[in-house]
């Protein structure tokens, strides 16, 4: 892989999406591509489709990767994977990795606590998935040292924002999944939800 130096590698000004792959299918691909487009517009990276990132390109990358790699577990079932798309001024990168969240981990449950680091709800960066991820990585490492699986970020008003590596969803009737920008509850606004 030949990656060129640009503002992403110097300042974290790049966008990414990590997409769950279950049984060879990309989960919420279109939603991820829309979110990547929003971040690319915000960071002035050019539109992903014009840079070679669209539904067809992502599906082709996955198909090619699956044809070249053994993606089945010992029982013959497809492993859960994650496809990551990274977009910077000068780079477009696709990568694959195993999804570390196994059935055993889900059955055990996740231990988490609240981070002392606060999100700045006035910063436009908190509304986009950017490569500027230092707080998340350091807090994830600290959570592991404290015996936790995850840490939750609050903003300066004490409202729930996100996890270090996870998104937070609110479910209504188990069919309707809402992130903070889609939630209709009066308790939630564009900057979080009160604890």
Residue ranges: model-predicted function:
Residues 18-20, 169, 194:
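Residues at secondary-structure transition points
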Residues 10, 161, 186:
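Short glycine/serine/threonine-biased micro-segments
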Residues 177-195:
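Glycine/small-residue-rich hydrophobic helix-like segments
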Residues 1-152, 156-157, 182:
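Conserved alpha/beta cores of soluble small-molecule-handling proteins
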Residues 159-181:
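Glycine- and Gly-Pro-enriched alpha-helical subdomains that act as flexible
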Residues 102-104, 170-171, 184-188:
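A short local loop/turn or secondary-structure capping micro-motif enriched for an aromatic residue
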């Amino acid at each position: 892989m030949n990656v060129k130096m640009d503002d992403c590698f110097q300042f974290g000004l790049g966008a990414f999406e990590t997409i769950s792959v279950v049984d060879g299918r990309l989960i919420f691909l279109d939603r991820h591509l829309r979110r990547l487009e929003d971040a690319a517009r915000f960071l002035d990276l050019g539109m992903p489709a014009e840079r070679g990132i669209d539904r067809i390109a992502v599906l082709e990358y996955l198909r090619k990767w699956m044809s070249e790699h053994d993606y089945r577990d010992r029982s013959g079932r497809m492993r859960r994977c994650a496809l990551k798309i990274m977009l910077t001024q000068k780079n477009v990168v696709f990568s694959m990795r195993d999804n570390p969240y196994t059935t055993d981990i889900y059955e055990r449950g996740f231990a988490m606590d609240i981070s002392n680091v606060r999100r700045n709800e006035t910063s436009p960066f908190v509304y986009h998935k950017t490569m500027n991820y230092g707080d998340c990585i350091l807090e994830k490492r600290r959570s592991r040292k404290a015996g936790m699986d995850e840490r939750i970020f609050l903003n300066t008003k004490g409202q729930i924002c996100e996890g270090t590596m996870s998104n937070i969803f609110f479910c209504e009737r188990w069919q309707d999944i809402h992130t903070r920008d889609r939630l209709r509850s009066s308790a939630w606004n564009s900057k979080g939800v009160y604890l």
